[in-house]
Amino acid sequence: MNLLIMGLPGAGKGTQAAKIVEEFGVAHISTGDMFRAAIANQTEMGRLAKSFIDKGELVPDEVTNGIVKERLAESDIAEKGFLLDGYPRTIEQAHALDETLKALDIKLDGVINIEVNPESLVERLSGRFICRSCGSTYHKVFNPTKVEGTCDVCGGHEFFQREDDKPETVKRRLDVNIAQGEPIIAHYRELGLVSDIQGNQDIDDVFADVKKAIAAIK
C-alpha cells in the first residue's frame, strides 16, 4: 500500500502519519529524514543537496526530486509500501513524483488529506506563549497557566510570544501553504485518489476515519 498524507501546518498530519506507520507497517518517508539519510550515506543526490545547504542556499527541486526517487527505489518500499509525508510541496513536485512513480513502476494508492478550518489553525498555532523568566511554554487554549498571568514553574509574571507564533505571521504562513497545496490536492482529486478527513476531532476519532479511508482504498 502506497500513500501520501497532506494537511496544513497544525492540522495533526504528523500525529496521524505516526499512527498509520504503526498500524499498517509501511515505510514512513518524510522529507527531513530523506535528506538526512541521503547526506549521511553520501548518495549522489545527497552530496548535491549538501553542496547547496553548505552554501546556505535552497535545494533545487531537481535535487529534492532525485532524493525522493533514490528513496523510493530502495528495497523496503517494494516489501512494505510507503507513506510519503511532506512531499510534494508544489504542483511541479507533484508532476515530478508522477514521473518517478511511473519510472519505478509504483502505483500510488491514495492521498489522505487532513482538513482543518484555517481559522482554527490560526488559534492552534498562535496560542503559544513563553515565560520570560524560565522559558516554560504554554498555550492559551490547550495548556494555559493554572493561575492567569503567573508561570506554573517559576511564578514569573512576564510572558512573550515568538514572532513565528504571532497570529499575523501564522496566517501568512498558512496562506502560502494553502496557495501551494490547493493545486496539488486538485491534481490528485482528478485522479480519484483523495480521501478527505475531518481534522477538527479528537486524535483517535481522526484516526478512526483515516483507517476507514484506508480500508476503502485497500
Curated annotation (Swiss-Prot):
Gene3D superfamilies: P-loop containing nucleotide triphosphate hydrolases (3.40.50.300). One of its GO terms (biological process) is AMP salvage. One of its GO terms (molecular function) is zinc ion binding. It comes from the Bacteria. Residues 127-165 are annotated as: LID. Residues 30-59 are annotated as: NMP. ATP binds at G10, A11, G12, K13, G14, T15, R128, T137, Y138, Q201. One of its GO terms (cellular component) is cytoplasm. It catalyses: AMP + ATP = 2 ADP. It is found in: Cytoplasm. The keyword Membrane does not apply. Pathway: Purine metabolism; AMP biosynthesis via salvage pathway; AMP from ADP: step 1/1. Its EC number is 2.7.4.3. AMP binds at T31, R36, E57, L58, V59, G86, Y87, P88, R89, Q93, R162, R173. Keywords: ATP-binding, Cytoplasm, Kinase, Metal-binding, Nucleotide biosynthesis, Nucleotide-binding, Transferase, Zinc. It is an enzyme of class 2 (transferase). PROSITE patterns: ADENYLATE_KINASE. Belongs to the adenylate kinase family. Monomer. Consists of three domains, a large central CORE domain and two small peripheral domains, NMPbind and LID, which undergo movements during catalysis. The LID domain closes over the site of phosphoryl transfer upon ATP binding. Assembling and dissambling the active center during each catalytic cycle provides an effective means to prevent ATP hydrolysis. Some bacteria have evolved a zinc-coordinating structure that stabilizes the LID domain. NCBIfam families: adk, PRK00279.1-2, PRK00279.1-3, PRK00279.1-4. This is Adenylate kinase.
